[in-house]
Amino acid sequence: MTMPLYASPEQILRDRSEYARKGISRGRSVVVLRYADGVLFVAENPSSTLHKVSEIYDRIGFAAVGRYSEFENLRQAGIRFADVRGYQNDPRDVTGRSLANVYAQTLGSIFTEQIKPLEVEICVAEVGHTPEHDTLYRLTYDGSIVEEPQHSVMGGQAETTATALKESYEEGLPLAAALRVAVKALSAGSASTGNGKPELLEAANLEAAVLERDRPRRAFRRLKGTALAALLQDTPPDDADADADAGKKPANDGNLPPNDDKS
């Protein structure tokens, strides 16, 4: 009679952690940081259709790395939670903290109860009416929450990117300066520009967005096209092009097809 295979709970959880970390390590990095007028999201993402940065609610944004189909499901679930809570109670009850708690419960339950953990790491950011009330929450695959005071880095080269970010980041930077700091940090950890190479990531390989403190109603705005290029070069964009880029509503990502590529 053969003995059944046995693995201790500790070993099972270690194996799940290693599996999730390996999946996340293959994804390109994302930087989320506070700047003078709100919160800035910058991701290395050459795709124009698969977004790693999105809007959740009026003043709440979402960024993620890992397996796209998994964090896209989390994003859509977060939107449903925020809409229902805001409708049944009050929009002021929808906060970054409440959303982060829901995500933590979901990630933790899947990690402990399912065979396969989610290969994702996410950040929930909320812009306050004053800088002191801006909040950043980073959540890992096992449901752990870390409240970041100034910035958060996720992805395969998070350590290298975070080190570069700490060297240049200052609190209260204007948008253009904060964007260049984030891009420089991402470039230091990128496989395409790192390893001592001086090149910076180009606008075509970046996804950027902001939560603007003084923007009425919906604080989320994507930075792209000539507006993004001008910010990277710190030059004023053509007025018509800048207005077009800034005035577009955030893209509706809800109907994107699932994709298992690591993002």
Curated annotation (Swiss-Prot):
The lineage of its organism: Bacteria, Bacillati, Actinomycetota, Actinomycetes, Pseudonocardiales. One of its GO terms (cellular component) is proteasome core complex, alpha-subunit complex. The 20S proteasome core is composed of 14 alpha and 14 beta subunits that assemble into four stacked heptameric rings, resulting in a barrel-shaped structure. The two inner rings, each composed of seven catalytic beta subunits, are sandwiched by two outer rings, each composed of seven alpha subunits. The catalytic chamber with the active sites is on the inside of the barrel. Has a gated structure, the ends of the cylinder being occluded by the N-termini of the alpha-subunits. Is capped by the proteasome-associated ATPase, ARC. This is Proteasome subunit alpha. CDD domains: proteasome_protease_HslV. Belongs to the peptidase T1A family. Keywords: Cytoplasm, Proteasome. One of its GO terms (biological process) is proteasomal protein catabolic process. The formation of the proteasomal ATPase ARC-20S proteasome complex, likely via the docking of the C-termini of ARC into the intersubunit pockets in the alpha-rings, may trigger opening of the gate for substrate entry. Interconversion between the open-gate and close-gate conformations leads to a dynamic regulation of the 20S proteasome proteolysis activity. Pathway: Protein degradation; proteasomal Pup-dependent pathway. It comes from the Bacteria. Residues 229-263 are annotated as: Disordered. Component of the proteasome core, a large protease complex with broad specificity involved in protein degradation. GO terms for molecular function: threonine-type endopeptidase activity. It is found in: Cytoplasm. PROSITE patterns: PROTEASOME_ALPHA_2. Signal peptide: none annotated. Its main location: cytoplasm.
